[in-house]
Amino acid sequence: MSLLKDFSYHTVCFALMKIVRTGNLSKQIKSLTELEIVSRNSPINKIGDNKKATFEINDNLLRFYFTFIYKNASALQVLGAEAFYDEYVAPTLTDFISRRFEGICRDYFSLQVRSGKLKGVRNIGSYYYDDPVHRKNGEFDVALELADGYAIYEAKYYAQPMTLDEIRREAQQVANIKELAVKQLGFIAINGFVEQEKPYTYLDGNDIFAGM
């Protein structure tokens, strides 16, 4: 976040808290985006759909503060750091980190394209899907737009290696989306895999961080 270094964290936090308190998003979000404090993200298949767009804080420290501390500051004062961590942070910390891991995986593919190691990629992001048969919608974590379809990767920040049953469930979920032209399906598991089967692509944490 190149421009954030010119501003104190107190200044940035004040600006973000003003948005949270007043709900006056439209007047503030442009400035925060220009300063690279927040970024606007859209699924690569819904670029022009404002309803599918989200804004997220780029800086990890600020993200942590507004996720865990901002709404619970009084509890932190009463409980102390250790008890506060056990009650408010620990139960959802893995989910917090896993969302950052998804971003790291997208950055990995971006670097692969920039370095010339990966060809034919037109865009990188997430993919929004709507599954009317099973009455559910959501996003696939990592999507690479190709000329004739998509490469889809499911990123998993698991404490244990990903199992074959989990792989098959994820693969079936992708297969259920009839509108999606999948040219390559892959899995990224921070701690690797218990077992692998064709025709999928597999990457673990070592692969991702070695390529960064």
What are these regions (language model features)?
Residues 186-212:
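Domain-level recognition of nuclease-like catalytic cores that cleave nucleotide substrates
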Residues 149, 155-156, 173-177, 190-192:
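Long, low-complexity, charge-rich intrinsically disordered regions
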Residues 163-185:
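Short, charged, amphipathic alpha-helix that recurs within catalytic cores of restriction-modification
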Residues 109, 140-161, 170, 185:
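Conserved catalytic cores of phosphodiester-cleaving nucleases, focusing on short active-site segments
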Residues 74-76, 117-120, 133-136, 140, ...:
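Extended hydrophobic-aromatic, low-complexity segments
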Residues 45, 158-159, 192-194:
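Conserved nucleotide-binding/hydrolysis micro-motifs of P-loop NTPases
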Residues 67-69, 154, 197-198:
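Short conserved micro-motifs at the rims of enzyme active sites and ligand-binding pockets
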Residues 1-137:
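Accessory nucleic acid-recognition modules appended to NTPase machines
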